[in-house]
Curated annotation (Swiss-Prot):
This is Capsid scaffolding protein. Region of interaction between pPR and pAP is called Amino conserved domain (ACD). The region of interaction with major capsid protein is called carboxyl conserved domain (CCD). SUPFAM superfamilies: Herpes virus serine proteinase, assemblin. Its EC number is 3.4.21.97. The lineage of its organism: Viruses, Duplodnaviria, Heunggongvirae, Peploviricota, Herviviricetes. GO terms for biological process: nuclear capsid assembly; proteolysis; viral release from host cell. Residues 421-483 are annotated as: Disordered. The keyword Transcription regulation does not apply. InterPro entries: Herpes_virus_sf, Peptidase_S21. A motif (Nuclear localization signal) lies at residues 445-451. The keyword Phosphoprotein applies. The gene is 35. GO terms for cellular component: host cell cytoplasm; host cell nucleus. Belongs to the herpesviridae capsid scaffolding protein family. Residues 336-355 are annotated as: Interaction with pAP.
Length: 646
């Protein structure tokens, strides 16, 4: 239902939801683009905006209290009070979902954990404008809770109070935050504290199930959620936990704030102020450390987990035996401090470290590294005795490299941090019982090594099709389709026909080329009578090629007869040539009259329709491109043509 109802007997569990419904200039294209002018024209909305689930108009669970136009994008704050929502989610959750906190959590806190991890995003529904229509106060239709919103940065936070719901958004301007809270209090006073939105459990169950089904194929859901959280600037949200294993706390105590990425310095949960910490406080194990100074080191309690032991072991291993080599100002360093050495300057530092020592070949080699006399080449003519033979540089005694030892310890500490922060490692999970968040020093340190995944990839890569168990497709890569047998057969037939046509054209070209021999080159054989000697050499230019028509099945092929013109032998009288020409003229005329009749008969036979097989009603008719056999064989036709031509 769209309107709220007041029911004093219902179990009221009001919670508040807040977040950006869009971000300006973040790559949203098409109809998803919201400009500052459009949002300014649409605010304030003409009517109250409902909050539903998965854009279902019949599944309204709350209402938007306030929307402000922040510098980064429109930001909303709403209230959710649907008793059936908490009941359905609590029934669906397993007994181990809340872990050790199951005994001490209230019903409202259970609802916050469930809805935060099931519906972490919001989606704004706006009215589609016409070609010449301008936006107005009726542009916004409703706000929907969903798994992943299509717009950038549309991750929401849920909490028990409006102030706590807005607190994790660190990039929200103070003026927008104050205006949002004031407007929300006024709207809530008009609604009343007992405002609830009732739904049937069957309807709510179907909607929640459809939300899960429609997002089953979403690739890297929690990676995408984490990316959207960074885009929205959320820090310190307790209830949204992308845990790699089952359970909210993953074996940690409630006081550890396990799962909170960054806790605000003012401690919006406890109200305690951490002095001297201008940025944030990060939990590690059971003890929080501040990032007030860039040289401050994170301290950990070694009794609370394996992460503190490994971190303390690697940090203590980096203590320098020669602190003066690391101090630029000459002041001694505190035990346990370390520095980051860029890879580009590593070689220069190593060379500078070696130049402070005497040259390797300044004196004779030590006795332990002297080369025995039997290993010296016999033809070696040295100006000094064999005992004074200088050893190569790599045979000298290695000196102590304090800088290299410290860099090695630093690399070991970085490797241990990466292993400790990798939540998917079962050994780390068993040893530490929870995966602590990254400190600001660690974030800056990792940022120098590589870019974040959400910066290196585009949004289109995350929204593409993927297949479980296979590698993710690269940008611009397309899955190759299965080759069609019919298309392959057709391509083979076309290639064969092209080859046949090329061969036929080559034969005609060779036959049509004139090849004349010099007069008197070929003389008649003496054993042959003179009247037959004219056939010993036939010049190709006097041969008439017969037209070879395609032979169809059922039509007998007739041998091709070439009409040969007689050749006049060299030295013979012109009168005899006239007699031979006169005797062959009637034969040429008779064959010339017979050739058109034969060609017309073959041509008329070629245009006769080929009988097609009748389709049977009991079988499935294949398409014409499948290449079914119709009683003709192209190979036989080709062979008959070639044999008749020969």
């Amino acid at each position: 239902m769209d309107a709220y109802t007041v029911d004093g007997n219902a179990v009221s569990l009001p919670i508040y939801v807040a977040g950006y419904i869009a971000l300006y200039d973040m790559g949203d294209g098409g109809e998803l683009t919201l400009t500052r002018e459009t949002v300014a024209a649409a605010l304030p909305p003409a009517s109250r905006l409902p909050i539903n689930i998965d854009h279902r108009n019949g599944c309204v669970v709350g209402e938007v209290l306030s929307i402000v136009d922040d510098a980064r994008g429109p930001f909303f704050l709403g209230i959710i009070n649907c008793p059936q929502l908490g009941a359905v989610l609590a029934t669906a959750a397993g007994p181990d979902f809340f872990g050790e906190l199951s005994e001490g959590l209230s019903e409202q806190e259970r609802l916050l954990y469930l809805v935060s991890n099931y519906l972490p995003s919001a989606s704004l529904s706006s009215r589609r404008l016409g070609p010449d229509e301008e936006p107005d106060e009726t542009l916004f239709a409703h706000v929907s809770l969903c798994v992943i919103g299509r717009r950038v940065g549309t991750i929401v936070t849920y909490d028990a109070t409006p102030e706590n719901a807005v607190a994790p958004f660190k990039r929200l301007s103070p003026s927008s935050r104050e205006e949002l809270l004031i407007t929300a209090r006024e709207a809530q006073s008009r609604l009343g504290d007992a405002a609830t939105w009732h739904l049937s459990e069957d309807t709510l169950t179907r909607v929640l199930l459809s939300t899960a089904v429609n997002n089953m194929l979403l690739r890297n859901r929690w990676n995408l959620v984490a990316r959207r959280r960074r885009e929205a600037g959320i820090e310190g949200h307790t209830y949204l936990q992308a845990s790699a294993s089952f359970g909210i706390t993953n074996g940690c105590n409630k006081a550890d704030f396990c799962g909170a990425e960054l806790v605000d310095t003012c401690g919006y949960k406890s109200g305690e102020k951490v002095h001297g910490a201008p940025y944030s406080r990060v939990t590690l194990g059971a003890k929080a450390f501040t990032s007030s100074s860039p040289n401050a080191l994170p301290s950990s309690d070694n009794d609370k987990g394996g992460i503190g032991e490994r971190t303390q072991k690697h940090i203590s291993a980096m203590a320098s035996s020669n602190p003066q080599t690391l101090s630029a100002a000459g002041a001694p360093l505190v035990s346990g401090d370390y520095i980051l050495v860029p890879a580009a300057q590593y070689n220069q530092l190593v060379v500078g470290q070696h130049t402070s020592h005497p040259p390797i070949n300044a004196g004779p080699a030590p006795v332990t590294h002297a080369v025995p006399s039997q290993y010296i080449p016999p033809a070696y003519n040295s100006l000094m005795p064999p005992s004074m033979y200088q050893a190569p540089p790599y045979w000298s005694v290695p000196h102590s490299a304090n800088l290299e030892a410290q860099i090695t310890a630093l690399v070991g500490a970085l490797a241990a941090d990466r292993k400790a922060t990798k939540g998917s490692d079962p050994h780390v999970i068993q040893g530490s019982q929870c995966s602590p968040p990254l400190s600001p020093q660690q974030e800056r340190r990792y940022a120098r090594k590589r870019r974040h995944d959400w910066d290196a990839t585009t949004r289109d890569d995350l929204e593409g099709i993927y297949y479980p168990g296979e590698r993710s497709p690269r940008p611009g890569e397309r899955r190759a389709g299965r080759p069609s047998t019919t298309i392959a057969d057709l391509m083979g037939a076309v290639s064969s026909l092209q080859q046949e046509v090329s061969q036929l054209r080559a034969i005609q070209t060779v036959t049509a080329q004139p090849q004349a021999a010099p007069a008197g080159l070929y003389k008649p054989i003496p054993a042959v009578p003179p009247q037959y000697s004219q056939y010993q050499y036939i010049q190709p230019q006097h041969a008439v090629s017969a037209i070879v028509a395609p032979q169809l099945p059922g039509i007998p092929s007739q041998p091709t007869q070439a009409v040969l013109a007689p050749q006049v032998p060299a030295g013979e009288a012109p009168g005899s040539a006239k007699v031979v020409a006169a005797s062959t003229a009637p034969q040429q005329a008779e064959q010339a009259r017979a050739a058109p009749q034969q060609f017309e008969a073959v041509t008329s036979a070629a245009v006769l329709p080929v009988t097609q097989p009748q389709a049977s009603s009991q079988t499935v008719d294949a398409s014409a491109s499948t290449g079914l056999e119709f009683g003709r064989d192209d190979a036989d036709i080709f062979v008959s043509q070639m044999m008749s031509a020969r």
